[in-house]
Curated annotation (Swiss-Prot):
The gene is LOT5. InterPro entries: ICln/Lot5/Saf5 (IPR039924). It comes from Saccharomyces cerevisiae (strain ATCC 204508 / S288c) (Baker's yeast). It is found in: Cytoplasm; Nucleus. This is Protein LOT5. Belongs to the LOT5 family. Present with 5930 molecules/cell in log phase SD medium. GO terms for biological process: mRNA cis splicing, via spliceosome; spliceosomal snRNP assembly. Pfam families: Voldacs.
Amino acid sequence: MMKKKPKCQIARTKPSVENVIPYNQFKKTQPRFNGNFSALNNEEYIILFGGGRDLILGSLTPCSSSHLSNQANPQDTSEYGTDLFILNSCIIIWFNGLGYGLEIPYSSVLYHASRRLPDGREGLQLEILLTLERDEVLDMLYQSLAPQACEFDGEEAHAFTVRSVELTIRPKYSIYDRHYNNEIETLFTFENFGVNRGDDLVNNCNEALAVCMDLHGEDVQDQDQEQYQDPSMAFEGAQDLNATYSGLGDTLHGPPVYQNDGLADDLDGDLVMDNVVSRGGPEASMSMEFYANQNLAGRKNSRDNE
C-alpha cells in the first residue's frame, strides 16, 4: 500500500525543555547510545539537533501577504520574531506573538544552504536558505503571485515542475552583540550549542539539517519508489539500487566501521591476481572498528616474509 507523503502542518505546541531534549543532553542520559543515529529516527525520543531564537524570517519567492485562511485579518509572519527548532522528527518554525508555528517534514525540504548577506557585518554575514515543496498549508501562509502569461508557456512545460517556496532565516544578533534574554534559556544553552548566534548559528543549523535530512533519506527513497516505480521494471530497479550513492546515510544508520570490499588473497604482490582477477579494482580488505583515543599501527607482509 502506498504511504501518504507527509505535508506541512500548523504546530500548536512550542518545543520546550519539557517536551524535547538537546542532543548533547541525550547522549549523557542514554549510556546505551553509541553513535548509531538510526535509533533516533522514531517517535520515542524528540531530540533537538539545532536551531535558535530571535530570528528574522523572510521569503525569496514572490508572495502576497502571508496569512491563514481561517483568520479574518491577514497577519504577516515576518513582523514577529521567530524561533527555529531542528528536531529529529521535523523542523518547527515558531512565530512568536501569533501562538502557532509551522511544522515541516524533512520530505518537504528540497534544498538548504547558507547565503551570504550583501549588507552583512562582522559576525553576521550569513543567513539560512530553505527551499520547501509547496502544499496546502504553505499555500495558505505564502500565497504565490500568479506568473505572467507567456506564449511559450504551456501545460507540458510545467508538468514536471516542482512548486516551491524559498525561505530565508536570518539571525537578529551577531556573534559579538551583547544581548540578554528576557527569560532564562533552557534549550539553546552554551553547554549544548555554544554561542549559537550570528554566523555560528547559521553553521550549526546547516550541520543539524544535514544530519536530520540524512536520517530521513530512506523514507524519502521509499516514497519515491512507491510513487514512480513501474512494477514491470522491478528487476532493473533492484540493480540500480546497488549503484546508488548513499552519502552519509551508511555512517549514520550503521555501526562505525570502515566500509570496503574486494578479493581476499592479494597480500603477496601477485601480478596475475592484480591484473587478471582484480583488474586494478578493489582488493582485499576487512571491516575494523576503532575506539576513540587509541593508537593504531599495522604492517603489510608478503608471503616470502611469513
